[in-house]
């Protein structure tokens, strides 16, 4: 009987990528298959996030819920990975002694060895070291599930923003060699992947050796140019980028590489220079706006999303008003916005915070309502337009229909004959948008002359 692994993921897209790799590692080493039901699992893993306190506490809440599964099935293994694991280490086992494995983002490739050691010794295994890029040398080839895929190009962060735990939980920035990244992307393209998203905590800080041991370094712009030349790759995305690392070379790539999408996630975090300085972000609002102005001169249709923190210690009404002014000026399509959550061990955790939580919540609600208005307005502006989408698979709303994604990351659902589904999935096609909803669109297939038989038979 095939053994199964259940993985619950908290937090960022890097964690989503790491969770997929956990499954790949355990499948290659022990033949485990992924399950969406913890009750069916032989191994349960939590890939955790420590960016906000709520996510961190949710992990321990979930651990409490699976404890009874362990009591009913003593051979069940429970593991905690990700940033909470890096931060808490063995204290997780002290707090939840039924946990068998504790591993950091850089040691997930050691899971099979940790499992063997746990079974042989009967003791919980903890490995939260930072072996730099070793992880990627031990990961099996990715198993493709659709025409889009994520490729991690670097690990860690060296920015040390005053509020952020990532440098402490994932380590400093370490870039994969260029040839390793290109080999992975080419392998994905050979399996039918048409769109890749390049991942990193500060992805545009990429500085990878041309090959392992080489003294010659490729920057992020060079990497994008090489990825664009790989046969089969038709779209390139990346996340998350940092305003401080937006070089002229990267701006030039937007003019030279049409496969790089008209969508950018560029966290600003705040609209007040005073708060940005307290956050140690390393740029001013004017410098941030300058990057966007230059980009939109090259790509007038650029869609922009961001991250914003509300209620950072010392934030005044005037500071928040500056954030709102920036939101209106930038016309953000999406914002991941949250109330500031002090993280132990970070410099900002020691700052005095006398803003009432009710006021922070009111500010957050105002910000999110404004962003939602932007989302609706941008969606409405797409009505009647023909959009190029990558067909990803059956629609979640109606499996008899198909769904794809536009360059600005909108999901488009559209009807298509069932017989045509296998041919259309993984293809770049044109759809005309005829309905706009808050977070998705509906369209109809646009057929070029001579394409009708291919789509209807």
Curated annotation (Swiss-Prot):
Cofactor: binding comment: Binds 2 [4Fe-4S] clusters. One cluster is coordinated with 3 cysteines and an exchangeable S-adenosyl-L-methionine.
Keyword S-adenosyl-L-methionine part of the UniProt annotation: yes
GO molecular function, one term: metal ion binding
Sequence ranges assigned to domain Radical SAM core in this UniProt record: 143-377
Record field: transmembrane: none
Pfam families reported for this sequence: Radical_SAM (PF04055), TRAM (PF01938), UPF0004 (PF00919)
Biological role stated in the UniProt entry: Catalyzes the methylthiolation of N6-(dimethylallyl)adenosine (i(6)A), leading to the formation of 2-methylthio-N6-(dimethylallyl)adenosine (ms(2)i(6)A) at position 37 in tRNAs that read codons beginning with uridine.
Reaction it catalyzes: N(6)-dimethylallyladenosine(37) in tRNA + (sulfur carrier)-SH + AH2 + 2 S-adenosyl-L-methionine = 2-methylsulfanyl-N(6)-dimethylallyladenosine(37) in tRNA + (sulfur carrier)-H + 5'-deoxyadenosine + L-methionine + A + S-adenosyl-L-homocysteine + 2 H(+)
Subcellular location: Cytoplasm
Residue stretches making up the MTTase N-terminal domain: 3-120
UniProt xrefs under HAMAP family: tRNA_metthiotr_MiaB
Family: Belongs to the methylthiotransferase family. MiaB subfamily.
Residues annotated for [4Fe-4S] cluster 2 binding in this entry: 157, 161, 164
Keyword hit for tRNA processing: yes
Alphabetized UniProt keyword annotations: 4Fe-4S, Cytoplasm, Iron, Iron-sulfur, Metal-binding, S-adenosyl-L-methionine, Transferase, tRNA processing
Gene: miaB
Enzyme Commission number(s): 2.8.4.3
Class of the enzyme per the UniProt entry, highest EC level: transferase
PANTHER family: CDK5 REGULATORY SUBUNIT-ASSOCIATED PROTEIN 1, MITOCHONDRIAL TRNA METHYLTHIOTRANSFERASE CDK5RAP1
GO cellular component: cytosol
Domain TRAM: 380-447
Quaternary structure annotation from Swiss-Prot or TrEMBL: Monomer.
Protein name: tRNA-2-methylthio-N(6)-dimethylallyladenosine synthase
